[in-house]
A protein has these predicted regions:
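Interfacial "coupling" helices/loops that link adjacent transmembrane helices in transporter permeases
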Residues: 16, 308-349, 696-734, 788, ...
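Membrane-helix entry/capping segments
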Residues: 1-6, 11, 15, 19, ...
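Hydrophobic, regular-secondary-structure patches
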Residues: 44, 53-112, 122, 151-159, ...
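Mid-to-C-terminal secondary-structure elements
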Residues: 120-133, 146-289, 490-674
Length: 804
């Protein structure tokens, strides 16, 4: 019996090839798009989930109630971690996590620039980075013990056993020996922690000088609480710790007008759940992704799948009119309601199976291109994940039940006598069809509006004046074994006579996100005239203002003609306002026991992303603070040739360093990569949603025209023109699209208004965006309808009325 249902279902699908293709192709596209978008969201939401003790691990951060506003920071002073563990038995393990004074690694004749991180021994007890070979109990037991990843072992040692081998790492001009005690398995690509080598935190730069200093924050701290200890309980204990170790800072903050929060505190030590750091703006370890984006991907995938389901439902209901006699005869012959439902549901099952198979094939073929376009690191293996398989099966069953079950249930309710006559109650069916079409175009209009607003915001970020000229400036990370000051001096001299090179300077901070992935800044705090001052700190070299085209408002720039400029600073406008001086030139700033003189004030420029407000900035030229980047301004014509000149010179100056130069405008664009990716996904989702909606609209319009063939013929005989016929067929559908636009407008405004709040600098949503989006939706719908209505209007009325 069931085989007979499937045979009939197959024949019906084969008989109505165009409708079958529209439904199967639309569903296949929807399945493929939903799967790819869901894989992206799954990857983002799976970050750091592989750690066994993830629920008990937290990152510490400060929240401070300054008079100038709230400040949050995840960087900690060196003595905090050991003091906290000694004070609180609820802390089972604690580790500091920082960069290293070393990066250049040497073994025999190999010298490589590797990612070296400094941690405490508890790190490998807290986090799940399994040891594949070597000492798994105390891998960092001795000061000069190190743990390397499998990838690092292969790069350094090839086929040799790395355990017990001695390697050297360079600090300044000297090399220090380390012993490999263990090899850790390579971390997955959904790990917030990345490293090639783990060494003891005692090798952190400036450790010896700052190990007892509480006012210099330069690394991150993670704690693992004992089982049963909640985050809130831990945070209730930390005020006593703050009052014990930060007495001077609390006094200074109160003196400057800091007001306590609801908890009565002006400075708090809080805990961020480790599984949230990938999505947190607080953490420096996380990628600063957004759960909003991940959830939006799931929402968009649901939208696309729902729109395809609506097409299926509407087409099934519409086709029931052409199959009314078949339904009636089956009822007369004794077919039960459940049998009719089984037959129609069987057709839906066949369509869904075909669509799923085709959709999986499309997703598999498009995955490499999808990864490239949207900067994803997904693999085909993710398709074999039990969670993904369950998601696909659940989606398949829901689609089949909804898209096939509802039309089958509706058709089975039709009156037997009326169906035999070929007459069906169209009122309720049309209401359902119209309601579903409205929902369909609400979702499509939402995606169109959101796409336009996201693109506007990104273009605003890209084109907003930054206070410096990012065009034609090359950013070159120094790296390598050479002293950074020496590398800068040699490259400057080497490029001095190149006509394509306009100026060369150095800095310890990149702008934007370079090819080396760095985008860090430094913070300093000090007292000035009994007032606490906090400022970002930037080490620059001579000609920085010239190279970056930054405006000097007052005073003078650093100059080699003045030998004492190494004891001077340049400040930005925001820093000048924080000092509270009408004329800050000549003011003396006391920092780490050194008096620094304000030489000049520069116009504010955005050295950080536009997500954040302009902050105070102090710039210094101090040879004992190494530079990490070289900035080179080049002639505006033939930029590739200029880059080749720089590359050739760099290879001569620093042959062992990797050439990772990039243009500053590229760096700033990378800063907004996630927004760019979101806009691309929105656009792709909008295009797919409109495409699938229009496929359904096309088919529904065709069925509506078939039902009204004789009416159209009679109207033509009575003198109706082609535009009148087109208007007759199109107006009801266009009205539904207009209703959808009206519904979508406030929803889109609310969603995008909240999204824009994550940017300090943002656009204002203009009314014309909604008008233009509505016009686009109406025009696309009208063109889709016209493809069929014009054809019907031009048809010979004799053909339409022949059966009469």
């Amino acid at each position: 019996m069931f085989s007979n249902y499937f045979k009939i279902a197959w024949r019906n699908l084969w008989k109505h090839k165009m409708f079958s293709v529209i439904v199967i192709f639309g569903m296949a596209i929807a399945f493929a798009a939903a799967l790819l978008l869901s894989l992206t969201a799954y990857h983002e939401l799976s970050y750091d989930q592989f750690h066994e003790h993830k629920k008990n691990i937290y990152q510490l951060y400060f929240h401070e109630q300054h008079a100038r506003g709230d400040e949050t920071s995840s960087t900690m002073p060196i003595p905090l971690a050991p003091a906290l563990k000694a004070e609180y038995p609820d802390v089972q393990y604690i580790t500091r996590f920082g960069g290293s004074a070393y990066s250049m690694v040497r073994y025999k004749n190999k010298e490589l620039d590797l990612d070296v991180r400094t941690v405490d021994p508890d790190f490998l007890r807290m986090f799940t980075f399994p040891i594949s070979t070597g000492n798994s109990q105390t891998p960092l037991g001795n000061l000069n013990d190190i743990v390397i990843t499998e990838h690092c072992a292969k790069v350094l040692f090839d086929q040799e056993d790395p355990i017990g081998k001695t390697i050297e790492m360079k600090r300044g001009t000297s090399w220090t020996s380390f012993s490999v005690t263990a090899v850790a398995k390579d971390f997955p690509n959904n790990s917030s922690f990345t490293f090639d080598i783990l060494s003891r935190f005692e090798h952190f730069h400036d450790y010896q000088e700052l190990q007892n200093t509480w006012d210099s924050d330069n690394h991150e701290v993670f704690v693992q609480l004992r089982d049963g200890v909640k985050q809130a309980a831990f945070e209730k204990q930390t005020p006593a710790f703050i009052h014990k170790f930060y007495t001077e800072k609390l006094t200074s903050m109160k003196r400057d007008g800091a007001q306590p929060n609801k908890s009565g505190e002006i400075m708090q030590l809080l805990a961020l759940p480790f599984t949230d750091i990938h999505f947190s703006e607080i953490s420096g370890t996380g990628a600063r992704a957004s759960k909003f984006y991940s959830y939006m991907l799931l929402v968009i995938s649901g939208f696309i799948l729902f729109i395809a389901c609506v097409n299926f439902v509407n087409l099934s209901l519409a086709r029931s009119f052409t199959r009314s006699k078949e339904i009636g005869i089956r009822k007369v012959m004794g077919a039960m309601r459940w049998q009719l439902i089984s037959q129609f549901w069987g057709e839906a099952l066949i369509v869904s199976c075909f669509a799923l198979i085709v959709g999986l094939g499309i997703a598999y073929l498009l995955l490499p291109y999808y990864k490239q376009v949207f900067y994803q690191v997904m693999s085909v293996n993710m398709l074999r994940s039990p969670l993904i398989i369950m998601y696909v099966l659940a989606g398949f069953l829901l689609v089949t039940l909804f898209a096939g079950g509802y039309p089958a249930w509706m058709v089975s309710k039709f009156n037997t006598i009326e169906t035999v006559k070929g007459k069906l109650p169209v009122g309720r069916s049309n209401k359902v069809r119209n309601s579903l079409m409205v929902v369909q175009f609400v979702l499509s209009s939402l995606l169109i509006i959101c796409t336009m607003i996201v693109w506007q915001q990104i273009n605003y970020l890209r084109n907003k004046p930054l206070g410096y000229n990012k065009q034609q400036v090359v950013s070159l990370p120094i790296g390598g074994t050479m002293d950074s000051e020496q590398a800068l001096s040699l490259l400057r001299n080497r490029l001095a006579h190149e006509p394509r090179i306009l100026s060369v300077t150095g800095t310890d901070m990149n702008i934007g996100r370079g090819r080396d992935g760095s985008s860090t800044t430094s913070m300093m705090g000090f007292d000035y005239k009994n007032k606490g001052i906090s400022t970002h700190w930037l080490r620059i070299d001579y000609d920085y203002l010239k190279t970056m085209d930054i405006q000097l408002l007052s005073g003078r720039d650093f100059s080699r003609s003045y030998g004492m400029d190494t004891a001077g600073v340049l400040i930005n406008e925001t820093m000048a306002r924080q000092l509270g001086e009408k004329d800050p030139l000549g003011s003396m700033l006391a920092l780490d026991g050194t008096q620094l003189k304000v030489l000049g004030v520069v116009k504010d420029f955005h050295f950080k992303s536009l997500h954040r407000e302009l902050a105070p900035l102090t710039m210094v030229v101090r040879p004992n603070w190494p530079v990490s980047y070289i900035f080179i301004r080049v002639q505006p014509d033939n930029l590739p040739a200029s880059m080749e000149v720089i590359k050739k010179a760099w290879k001569e100056v620093n042959p062992k360093a990797t050439f990772l130069a990039s243009f500053l405008d590229e760096n700033t664009d990378r800063t907004y990569k996630k927004e760019t990716r979101l806009s691309q996904i929105f656009m792709s989702g909008a295009v797919l949603a409109i495409l699938i909606s229009c496929m359904g609209l096309f088919a529904i319009a065709l069925l509506a025209i078939i039902q009204r063939t004789k009416e159209i013929g009679i109207r033509k005989v009575l003198g109706a023109s082609v535009p009148q016929i087109v208007g007759l067929v199109s107006k009801d559908f266009l009205l539904l699209v207009l209703v959808a636009i009206v519904i979508a407008t406030p929803i889109a405004w609310y969603v995008m208004h909240n999204w824009l709040q994550s940017f300090y600098y943002r656009i204002h949503i203009a009314w014309w965006v909604f008008a233009l989006a509505g016009l686009i939706a109406l025009v696309i719908a009208f063109i889709t309808l016209s493809l069929q209505s014009v054809k019907a209007a031009l048809k010979n009325p004799v053909t339409s009325l022949r059966s009469e």
